[in-house]
Amino acid sequence: MRKIRPLAFVLATGLGFCGTVSVASADGDAGAYLAARLAGSQADYVLAAQYYARALAADPQNTQLMENAAISEVGRGAVDKAIPLARSFDTKGGRNQIADLLILTELAQKEDFAAAIAALDAGRSAGQLVDGLYRAWALLGLGQMSEATGAFDAVTKISGLKSFGLYHKALALASVGDFEGADAIFAGADGGPLRATRRGVMAHVQILSQLERKADAIALIDESFGPAGDPTMMALRLELEAGATLPFTVVKGARAGLAEVFYTVASALGSENTDLNTLAYARMAEYLAPEEADAILLVANILERQGQHALASAEFDKIARDDPAYLQAELGRAAALVQSGRVDAATEALQRLAKDYPDRIEVWNTLGDTYRREEQFAEAAVAYDKAIGKISGDEAGYWSVWFARGICNERLKQWPQAEADFRKALALRPDQPAVLNYLGYSYLERKERLDEALGMIERAVAARPDDGAFVDSLGWGLYRLGRYAEAVTQMERAVELMPVDPVVNDHLGDVYWAVGRIREAEFQWRRALSFGPEEETEAARIRRKLEVGLDRVLAEEGAAPLAVTKNDR
């Protein structure tokens, strides 16, 4: 699970939430307060909201509790409950960006655009970018289009924000029927074409359709997503091919425009390590546009990254079956179910998807991954067979499917098929370190192609020098080749990188034994046992080495004895 910093601290560095709440501030119910803090530190918004509500009931005038309660309600998606808390916080003299964000969102939801502008004029702020775009859309909501255009232009003049201002100006023009003006912006009349975000492409496609440029719209979809990409875009493409004129639906009015502002900011923050800030803006977007699939999916993905799998699953569930985004949502829901331990439910959902979408490679691939995760390798291999059977044209992007099937075949002891899959994956992606390492290590274990295996692993380690598994493979390869002194250096490095891995510690023990460091070998074998080998056969072999030594174990297994030395090679 991803590590989450304490809730209040995260927000203090982003949206301006207060950094700490003293225990003394929650004297009415210190236990509830402490439980809320713990839940918040784990991003458990539901539990945090429950405990903050209890603490606030015992101390209803406490503004810091109001603030933290509002944070938790936003996190769990109860924006309608967070808004009154923000209002109370504000009335009692509290002031910060989360309260301002919630109050501005409430005004947008009510479409009280005059009050929204007055709030900005009075100093309320949700951040420089939001404030500028919010003002522009509110002016549009008041019917003041020329003033709105000027406000969008003002945003474009702020350093680093030009593309945001242009994008929203284009949406605003399209929302009032000026498709020529909107197309000019997307095409680059104001200094180069806008960066092709998914939402931007969707908007431009709809604009081109309105301008009766269907061929250009189809070409834009193909250029941006390929022949079998995003299901929503493919649905638009089918409509265009059928001769339909697409309505402009990305933004239908000022409130939807304000929702798009919050979605834009959340998406921009998505690549940064500020998930709670991102979630707050995404929740505002969802609140203002509850039917917007993109906002729902963004919220769900953020929650998934935070480890809040139940909340994420509930979000994915909001996407209707007839929505083109349903496939993406169900794949996301299945992933959330897996992460929450409900693998059977995830498998069932994926099996249904496979029946409904039998030609979608990603469905079969995800089903295979789910089976493989549970070590159901035969079932996984069948699913990967289906996925590979659907691949046509450029195969390079699907190297991982052959790699995954190769792992299944290797585990099923079907080595010829496994080797062929690994070789195919390497043919598609020659320098892929995971494939190089896995195939190289497999050759080592089979005592085949040892020199080639070592070369593969060396390439993998060169690509990922801090990957303990790869360094372990390199050390083990040197050991297999009898280059024991060199193996010691690599295996010691592997243990530094993976100190509690039983296999790596066991390997280091063998290498120490090979160079005569008997006590250190025994110490490493005991460490390996303490970390719990996955298989009892592995543990039994380690215990036998401790009883009689590695040389005797190799003799009992009919294996070749250790070389005297090959370190001069």
Label for each model-derived stretch:
Residues 40, 74, 108, 140, ...:
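Position-specific recognition of the canonical hydrophobic site in helix A of tetratricopeptide repeat
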